[in-house]
Curated annotation (Swiss-Prot):
Higher taxonomy: Eukaryota, Metazoa, Chordata, Craniata, Vertebrata
Protein name according to UniProt: Heparanase
Reactions accelerated catalytically: endohydrolysis of (1->4)-beta-D-glycosidic bonds of heparan sulfate chains in heparan sulfate proteoglycan
Keywords: Cell adhesion, Disulfide bond, Glycoprotein, Hydrolase, Secreted, Signal
Keyword Nucleus: no
Gene name as annotated: HPSE
C-alpha cells in the first residue's frame, strides 16, 4: 500500500528537466542602442485621417510612454501611397484635437473627450476595411494633411520617442527617377514647425512590382537616397538628420541582390541599414510554428545573410530591423495577439541583440491586424507586458549565455547587464531571460560562483482557461492590467533564495535578475 501511495505521489509531480547555465560575465559580446526595442505605427492608419486622432487618447499615450525611449516608425505599404497636401482642410476630429492642443488641457478636455469615444466605436469597421484592402493587394493614394503630421509628431515626442517618417518612393518621373517635389513640401512644413524627425524613403521596394507594377533596381534606389540626403542638407534642422533604408523585406535571393546593389550606390547616404523579418505567413501559421525551434532558428540565418551583404559593401554600418513581428499579412489571428506569440518576440529580441542588430522595431504598437501590442479597445496584450518587462529590466550590454543539455534549443536563454535605470538594481547585476519550448518544467542551474546570490524572478504565465492562447498574462501569479488610463501597474518581483534553481514551467518564459552578481562586463 505504501509503495502504491509513493508511486501515485511521484506521478502527480510534473516531469522536470535540469540544465546547467553557462554565463559569460567577464566581458560583453556586444551592445545595442538604448532604443533597441522600438515601435511602429502602420501608415495605413492615415487611410482615414480621422483615426489618427486616436493617438491623443491618454491611455495610448500612457502605454507608449511605458516603452520609451525609442523610435516610432510611421511606415509600411501605405507609405508609398501617401501624398502630402498642405492646403487640404483638417477633419472635424483633427480640428477638435488642434483646439485641444492649443488651449489649456482642462478647458479643452470636454470637447476632445467626445472624439476618442466616437472613433473607438467606428474603429473595428475601419480595421476590417484596412485588412481587406491589404489582402486584395489593391492600393490607392491617400492624402495626408498638416494636422496628421502634427498629431504624429506630438504623440511621438510626448511619449518619449523619435518619429521616423517614411516618404513616398513611388512618385516617379520618366526614366524612373524619384520625383521629390512632394517630399520637399513635407520637409519644408516639418522644418517650419521645428519637428525633430528621422527619415526613410519607401517600404519593401522588392515588392514594388506587385504593389504598383513598377520595378526599380537597387542602383537607382541608392541614387534616390543620395538625392534625399541632399534635400535634407538644405534645411539647417535636417542637415544632420538620420536617414534609414532600404527597408527591404525577407532576404531572399532577389531581395539580397537589390540590397547589395543599393548599398554600393547609396549605402554611404544612410545612417543605418533597415530590413524586415517575419517568421511565417499569418494565413497559414499554426500554434506549433510559434513553439518550433526550427522556425525560431530561421531568424539567425536571415540575420547572417543581411550582415554579410552590409559588411561586404559598407563595413561597419549599423543594421536595424525596421519592421518585424511574428507573422506577415497582419499577423496570425488567435495566435499573434496571445501569450504564445511571446515565444517568437522574446527570442527575436534575444537573438537580434546577440547577433549584432542595433534596433528592433515592433510592428505594430496599435493598428489593424493581429500582431499589435494593444488591441482595438486599447487593452494591452501579452506582448505589450513582455515588452514592458524587457524595457524595465534589460540593459544594452549583451553577454554570452548557453545551456548544457541534450536539446539545448528548447530552453533558450539570453543574458544582458541589468538596465542601470532600474531603481532596485545596481552596476554588476545581470538579467537572464529564458523561454521553455518543451512540455515539461525546465530547471535552470546557475553557475557555482552565483549560488550565493539572490535572484528576482519575473515569471510570465498565461491567465485564464485559454492557456497559451490567452490574451491576458500574469506576472508571478498576479494578473497584469492597467490601474487606470494614466497608470501602469507595479511590476512586482518574486525573490528566490540563494542557491535556488530557476524553475521555468512548460511552455513559459520569464526574466531573472541576479543581484550583486558583480559581473565585470557590467561595471
Amino acid at each position: 500500500m505504501l509503495v502504491l501511495l509513493l508511486l501515485v505521489l511521484l506521478l502527480a509531480v510534473p516531469p522536470r528537466r535540469t540544465a546547467e547555465l553557462q554565463l559569460g560575465l567577464r566581458e560583453p559580446i556586444g551592445a545595442v542602442s538604448p532604443a533597441f526595442l522600438s515601435l511602429t505605427l502602420d501608415a495605413s492608419l492615415a487611410r482615414d485621417p480621422r483615426f489618427v486622432a486616436l493617438l491623443r487618447h491618454p491611455k495610448l499615450h500612457t502605454l507608449a510612454s511605458g516603452l520609451s525611449p525609442g523610435f516610432l516608425r510611421f511606415g509600411g505599404t501605405s507609405t508609398d501611397f501617401l501624398i502630402f497636401n498642405p492646403n487640404k482642410d483638417s477633419t472635424w476630429e483633427e480640428k477638435v484635437l488642434s483646439e485641444f492642443q492649443a488651449k489649456d488641457v482642462c478647458e479643452a478636455w470636454p470637447s476632445f473627450a467626445v472624439v476618442p469615444k466616437l472613433l473607438l466605436t467606428q474603429w473595428p469597421l475601419q480595421e476590417k476595411l484596412l485588412l481587406a484592402e491589404h489582402s486584395w493587394k489593391k492600393h490607392k493614394n491617400t492624402t495626408i494633411t498638416r494636422s496628421t503630421l502634427d498629431i504624429l509628431h506630438t504623440f511621438a515626442s510626448s511619449s518619449g520617442f523619435r518619429l521616423v517618417f517614411g516618404l513616398n518612393a513611388l512618385l516617379r518621373r520618366a526614366g524612373l527617377q524619384w520625383d521629390s517635389s512632394n517630399a520637399k513640401q513635407l520637409l519644408g512644413y516639418c522644418a517650419q514647425r521645428s519637428y525633430n524627425i528621422s527619415w526613410e524613403l519607401g517600404n519593401e521596394p522588392n515588392s514594388f512590382r506587385k504593389k504598383s507594377g513598377i520595378c526599380i533596381d537597387g542602383f537607382q534606389l541608392g541614387r534616390d537616397f543620395v538625392h534625399l540626403r541632399q534635400l535634407l542638407s538644405q534645411h539647417p534642422l535636417y542637415r544632420h538628420a538620420e536617414l534609414y533604408g532600404l527597408d527591404v523585406g525577407q532576404p531572399r535571393k532577389h531581395t539580397q541582390h537589390l540590397l547589395r546593389s543599393f548599398m554600393k550606390s547609396g549605402g554611404k547616404a544612410i545612417d543605418s541599414v533597415t530590413w524586415h523579418h517575419y517568421y511565417v505567413n499569418g494565413r497559414s501559421a499554426t500554434r506549433e510554428d510559434f513553439l518550433s525551434p526550427e522556425v525560431l532558428d530561421s531568424f539567425a540565418t536571415a540575420i547572417h545573410d543581411v550582415l554579410g551583404i552590409v559588411e561586404a559593401t559598407v563595413p561597419g554600418k549599423k543594421v536595424w530591423l525596421g519592421e518585424t513581428g511574428s507573422a506577415y499579412g497582419g499577423g496570425a489571428p488567435q495566435l499573434s495577439n496571445t501569450y504564445v506569440a511571446g515565444f517568437m518576440w522574446l527570442d527575436k529580441l534575444g537573438l537580434a541583440a546577440r547577433r549584432g542588430i542595433d534596433v528592433v522595431m515592433r510592428q505594430v504598437s496599435f493598428g489593424a491586424g493581429s500582431y499589435h501590442l494593444v488591441d482595438a479597445g486599447f487593452k494591452p496584450l501579452p506582448d505589450y507586458w513582455l515588452s514592458l518587462l524587457y524595457k524595465r529590466l534589460v540593459g544594452t550590454r549583451v553577454l554570452q549565455a548557453s545551456v548544457e543539455q541534450a536539446d539545448a534549443r528548447r530552453p533558450r536563454v539570453y543574458l544582458h547587464c541589468t538596465n542601470p535605470r532600474h531603481p532596485k538594481y545596481r552596476e554588476g547585476d545581470v538579467t537572464l531571460f529564458a523561454l521553455n519550448l518543451s512540455n515539461v518544467t525546465q530547471s535552470l542551474q546557475l553557475p557555482k560562483q552565483l549560488w550565493s546570490k539572490s535572484v528576482d524572478q519575473y515569471l510570465l504565465l498565461p491567465h485564464g482557461k485559454d492557456s497559451i492562447l490567452s490574451r491576458e498574462v500574469q506576472l508571478n501569479g498576479r494578473l497584469l492590467q492597467m490601474v487606470d488610463d494614466e497608470t501602469l501597474p507595479a511590476l512586482h518581483e518574486m525573490a528566490l533564495a540563494p542557491g535556488s534553481t530557476l524553475g521555468l514551467p512548460a511552455f513559459s518564459y520569464g526574466f531573472y535578475v541576479i543581484r550583486n552578481a558583480k559581473a565585470i562586463a557590467c561595471i
